[in-house]
A protein has these predicted regions:
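Nucleotide-activated chemistry modules centered on ATP-dependent adenylation/adenylyltransferase
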Residues: 2-410
């Protein structure tokens, strides 16, 4: 047992059987050791919910659990993430202050799956690796409270008030391997880049720290032309001269690679976190950047004026709730239902060009679009323009009333 004297002052919760939301990273791996040593836990279950980990990361998680003498359980949640989460994100043009709410979604999916597993296994507590300074602790706890309200929630890093350096030192005491490379959180929808250097506002992330994105100076000198098809609001196909890719997940993987190569998808922003403090966040999301830009444009073509005016309000509420840990909140469900119901007419095919960070729309077609140039254009007869005269008089009546009241604008 590592010497922890003086490292905590609160009374730690005690439990017998605990399911750990486990990625194999520093925080959750350390929990596997701390639970039996300081929380009285007799049985620890390490549960990895895969929403985008590589084979190497999965093997690292498995080997660390084995090193700790803890059984490891793997849940594949990528299909659910695509079908139930990314689809709603596209319908809602997901954006919280410019961030496509990827980690916000995955944490809540992971929390639900781990909570359900804990109940199935007869656990009396759930453990997760959040710090006390971030957003994930709120997201995870919200979901734990909804799906396993009677189970204790253990958060060792927060309860011991660890600094990152203390965690590294303690991992060394426990002989747990630690990869000192740049931290990240990756799904197919977005990858966040975590590093202490991000707090340095003069620092530019090195090219080698990106998975998909290339800086414009490293991007190809020739553009890449693509055709992307949407059906009922979702991208179903992307084609180039060399490839033809179908299916939402495959389209996203393809656009992450090709979009990133062409310098699309870097997000370097200031984010207002759940506790009200600003943080600098760096993300790469090439597929999300391309698809959301085209989806918004297609909605402008296919939705009514009133839908276009109202839907962004619903989208903002949806993104806010998801970011703040409310994926399963009733109002989030209501917003998602509205957005989904609006998508039946959002159909079209786009020809686009990717070039050194730009997304250029070359052409669009839609069988359900509301653009009617034969009516709007002055080059065609359309309707008798004289019919608009009486309509303008009716439309202006309120302004005549305002003038009589002496409320003219100065």
């Amino acid at each position: 047992m590592a010497d922890m004297s003086g490292r905590y002052v609160i009374e730690l919760p005690q439990a017998k059987k605990v399911a750990v939301a486990y990625s194999g990273g520093l925080d959750s791996a350390l929990a596997l050791k701390l639970l039996p040593d300081y929380y009285g836990v007799e049985e620890v279950l390490a549960v990895t919910c895969n929403v985008g980990l590589t084979e190497a990361e999965l093997e690292e998680a498995r080997s660390k659990a084995e090193l700790c003498g803890v059984p490891w359980f793997l849940m594949d949640a990528e299909q659910e993430f695509v079908e139930d989460f990314i689809t709603r994100a596209i319908y809602a043009n997901s954006s919280y202050e410019g961030y496509p709410v990827a980690t916000s979604m995955t944490r809540q999916l992971i929390a639900r799956r781990v909570a359900e597993f804990a109940l199935e296994q007869g656990c009396d507590a759930i453990c997760e690796g959040s710090t006390g300074k971030g957003n994930d602790q709120y997201r995870m706890n919200n979901v734990f409270s909804m799906f396993a309200p009677d189970l204790k929630v253990i958060v060792p890093v927060r309860e011991f008030n660890f600094t990152r350096q203390q965690e590294k030192e303690l991992s060394a005491e426990y002989n747990l391997p630690y990869n000192p490379g740049i931290g990240d959180d990756r799904t197919m929808w977005c990858r966040s880049i975590g590093s202490g250097e991000v707090d340095n506002l003069q620092m530019r992330i090195a090219q080698e720290d990106y998975l998909w994105f290339r800086y414009p100076e490293n991007a190809p000198d020739q553009p890449t032309d693509l055709e992307i098809e949407f059906q009922a609001g979702l991208p179903v196909r992307v084609s180039s001269e060399a490839e033809d890719v179908c299916g939402l997940a495959q389209v996203i993987h393809y656009l992450n690679r090709v979009g990133g190569e062409n310098a699309l998808g870097k997000i370097d922003m200031f984010e207002d976190g759940m506790i009200g403090l600003k943080s600098r966040e760096v993300y790469e999301a090439p597929a999300a950047a391309i698809l959301l830009a085209l989806h918004r444009d297609l909605e402008q073509l296919c939705l009514t004026k009133e839908q276009i005016q109202f839907k962004p309000q619903v989208e903002r509420q949806w993104s806010y709730m998801v970011y703040h840990g409310g994926w399963y909140h009733p109002v989030t469900m209501d917003c998602a239902a509205f957005c989904a119901n609006s998508q039946w007419a959002v159909n079209g095919v786009y020809q686009v060009r990717l070039y050194k960070g730009t997304l250029d729309i070359l052409g669009r077609q839609s069988s359900t679009g509301l653009f009617a140039p034969e009516l709007r254009s002055l080059a065609t007869a359309g309707w008798d323009q004289r019919e608009s005269g009486p309509a303008t008089k009716i439309h202006a009546m309120q302004y005549k009333i305002l003038a009589k009241r002496g409320l003219k604008a100065e």
